[in-house]
Amino acid sequence: MNSSFSAPAKKSLGQHFLADRYYIDRIVQAVDPRPGQHLVEIGPGQGAITFPLLRKHGALTVIEFDRDLIAPLTDAAAPIGQLQIIHRDVLAVDFTAVADGTPIRLVGNLPYNISSPILFHALDHASAVADMHFMLQKEVVDRMAAGPGSKVYGRLSVMLQAYCEVTALFVVPPGAFRPPPKVDSAVVRLVPRDAASVLIKDRKRFADVVRAGFGQRRKTLRNALSTVCEPAHFEAAGVRPDARAEQLEVADFIRLANVELA
């Protein structure tokens, strides 16, 4: 039984609504909600994932920016379960406050045009998040999960993997959406690392080092990081200054950012 409703996709909001039952079921299976967990869906859209999750779990919080979807979501959810709707831009939502002491499980088919800002916003609240299951452009998921030496290994890879375990799950073709996007999508799982295992001393400095390193990725680290690192930083961290950012492991960036010179 599918309770999703029809609503026109808004290009300005980057909306592509999932419509294929097979992939909807695969996402719900990947999330595998359990009693007592607090599920939060970002951008429920027409309810393709919302209502199967609600039917399976009984309660769900959703964050929806499009006011035209609020009433249809409310009406369709009424006979199924308890749906709490937060009508707000997701980037303005305080996930820590939403969690209220119980780590939340984030789910969502993220709008292509703001997927990276949403990911970094979620990272800011990692201590309040149990895990995340997101559908994004496959190109973005490839970058998120990439390792050193890959052409798509970059700032997004390092920043996410420093704070989360990142696992690409499966690809979703354009035909599974209405309207179909021009590219493949993919589902990814992110599990925030325990705070004690994230050995980053200064989050801002770490972000600055990673940004500078990949901002000029064809240059050696000596040149790319000239504004944020001195030669002694490389020596203390055991990182070769003639290497390039794409050759460094996540742990290398962490050591480099953590160095404190006397």
Swiss-Prot record:
It is found in: Cytoplasm. It holds the Pfam family RrnaAD. It is an enzyme of class 2 (transferase). Its EC number is 2.1.1.182. GO terms for cellular component: cytosol. It comes from the Bacteria. Signal peptide: none annotated. GO terms for molecular function: 16S rRNA (adenine(1518)-N(6)/adenine(1519)-N(6))-dimethyltransferase activity; RNA binding. It catalyses: adenosine(1518)/adenosine(1519) in 16S rRNA + 4 S-adenosyl-L-methionine = N(6)-dimethyladenosine(1518)/N(6)-dimethyladenosine(1519) in 16S rRNA + 4 S-adenosyl-L-homocysteine + 4 H(+). S-adenosyl-L-methionine binds at H16, L18, G43, E64, D89, N109. InterPro entries: KsgA/Erm, rRNA_Ade_diMease-like_C, rRNA_Ade_Mease_Trfase_CS, rRNA_Ade_methylase_Trfase_N, rRNA_adenine_dimethylase, SAM-dependent_MTases_sf. Keywords: Cytoplasm, Methyltransferase, RNA-binding, rRNA processing, S-adenosyl-L-methionine, Transferase. Specifically dimethylates two adjacent adenosines (A1518 and A1519) in the loop of a conserved hairpin near the 3'-end of 16S rRNA in the 30S particle. May play a critical role in biogenesis of 30S subunits. NCBIfam families: ksgA. Belongs to the class I-like SAM-binding methyltransferase superfamily. rRNA adenine N(6)-methyltransferase family. RsmA subfamily. HAMAP family: 16SrRNA_methyltr_A. This is Ribosomal RNA small subunit methyltransferase A. It comes from Xanthomonas campestris pv. campestris (strain B100). The gene is rsmA.
